Amino acid sequence: ISRALFKDAVSVLSLGDGNKNPAATLKVSTAGKLTYSDLVSFWNGFDPYELNTVIASPDIAAAILNMPEMRDAAAGLNFHATGKAVTPLGANMLKSSAAQAGTLIGLDKNCALEMVEAGGLLTEYDKLIDRQIERAAITQTAGFAKIFTDASKILTTKA
């Protein structure tokens, strides 16, 4: 359920919630190549919001971790000791295939998105004694809405 909700959240961040409010898409300076300068420009474009979370496609996460700026001795020591990778400009980085290849989604987690739920988590059980079958269904009704459109942006390496 949590993976499906995360995928829905990424979709709403990228495409909007049906109110003509998709995230602004910015392109890197050189198509197909992400640079530290691109990350700084992306971070700088969030004023008055704070870029505190990024959702990176697996290829972009690897590109960020392979940047010389992300491979200094202290960052490497922390990564090897704790397993926590250094993050771009202090933002919490989530690697997910829910983001399209070549895409980095940046957001202010306090202002970009809200989860709207109808009821809670519902668990139902069913038993057929004569056939020795037992099954369970777990459902949740939820959706996402954007709070402030400018609190999320997309950086793409595509031309």
Regions found by a protein language model. Name each.
Residues 1-46, 154-159:
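Alpha-helical scaffold segments that mediate packing/assembly in large oligomeric complexes
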Residues 27-34, 40-91:
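A contiguous, surface-oriented mixed alpha/beta subdomain in the mid-to-C-terminal portion of proteins
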